[in-house]
């Protein structure tokens, strides 16, 4: 092996420092990179103080970038979608006829030198244009059988402009012949080279088209259009005099005309291959321009043979254009606005009404027919199938059968018992109703009055002959106990209480002695006893007293009242002890109120009271007659004042006694209710 060579490790590339803010173009940066070598890093790279400025994404930068790229152009007219159900045979026949006509036209007009060499190129250009048009329009132009294609227009245009195109072409040929006679051999060789190059290009194109187009399909070729374009580029159709002047110019510069033709051909090819969408829009515009040019050519003076062809072409073009517009669904704009016919409009309005009437009549007739058909009975085509018998239940087992029999017997017994009991009860009820009907008629009024007594009772008020239901139950309970026998009472007592529960514990063992020795407390339901007694009692005793001469007239009036109260018999007082039949003596009431609460317990405190009462009784026995008392009262005004004071004091005392010392009546009522419930 050769001696080992140590490989050289390249240095790490470093970023080149640039003082420019914006980067250079691609070519300049490439040259700089090729010429300059990466510098060796001296140390740590310097951190830039400013951030590089970015390009502003404005409309100017956007537009500058978009100018370089070719933007697609929007066509002027929207392409019309056509159906693909047409037969291809019609298309083939039409194209074959058009090709034959084009060949006949080309054979008639033999163009010398330049025209012969131009014709194949123009034909091939027309083929290429037709191929791209068919690709973009989805074979729409080739499938129209009735409407004339743009080739027919070009044929008529070629027929109309043949003479106008022949004259400048002949002039060009003459000029070329004159140039060839006077020019040197070098010029001839150069022309031959150019023509040979054009022929080679035409051959290549034809070979390319044969690959693209199938053998059965024939392509529409627009020869007259290309011939006219070539003639227009060489000499615009502005009359015969202008063509003669321009023919002289072409004789002077034959080479320039060839170069212009070549440029024109190349431009067309680039348009066809680059912008097929633009071609569609330009073809429609070119067709319009050709129609205008045809009208101008027709206006020029021509021979008799040419005029006949032009007339035929125009006559054929007009219906073909209308047919093409109908099939392509292109709207036709009329020249004048149509006038409205009022009569026809009225007829149209009347027609739907009549139609609606007819439709309604037909509907009514159909409804009537259906109703009649529904009424007619129809015999069914097939007999209804009989229902299958129900499935036989399985025999139950012996136990189930015995259980069912037992249930049936019990149900039958219950029915018999219920029937007998209901019959007996019904007969008893009927007998009771007859007996009770006479009794109820008499007692209804009494029951009604008795019910009213308890409706409007105030709190604390109880009827003497009626007790509340709770008291009646409690009072009647000892009677029921006496009726029950000793055995029934023992059974009732030994019955389980609702509140007691069975103690949880071990079942198979005896309870401990402490728990077993505990006696159970038995609650007696009927231990409550009720006692009725009077809460308060008022007793009044009156006696005759002798009135002394020194007594005042007020004391005399009091004594007179005491005497009146004595005249009431004592029997009435015993019958109604709770009622106050006469007014009490005000002095006695005052003395009773002033007594302390423990006055009854002290017997000594009652002695002076008894003495005072005895003295008063002695004074009252010697009382004056009422006539004398009245006479004495009229003489003295002081007696009237004292009487008024006494009356006021008595009213206050009576109110205090009735209210029980309460300020409000509601509080007194509540206290009465509380005392009643405590009973």
From Swiss-Prot:
Disulfide bonds listed in the record: none
Reported consequences of knocking out the gene: Increases the sensitivity to farnesol.
Chief location category: cytoplasm
Residues annotated with Phosphothreonine modification: 18, 58, 85, 277, 552
GO biological process: mitochondrion migration along actin filament; negative regulation of actin filament polymerization; negative regulation of barbed-end actin filament capping
Oligomer and partners: Interacts with ribosomes. Interacts with ABP1.
Misc note: Present with 450 molecules/cell in log phase SD medium.
Family stated for the protein in its record: Belongs to the AIM21 family.
UniProt protein name: Altered inheritance of mitochondria protein 21
Native organism: Saccharomyces cerevisiae (strain ATCC 204508 / S288c)
Gene name for this UniProt entry: AIM21
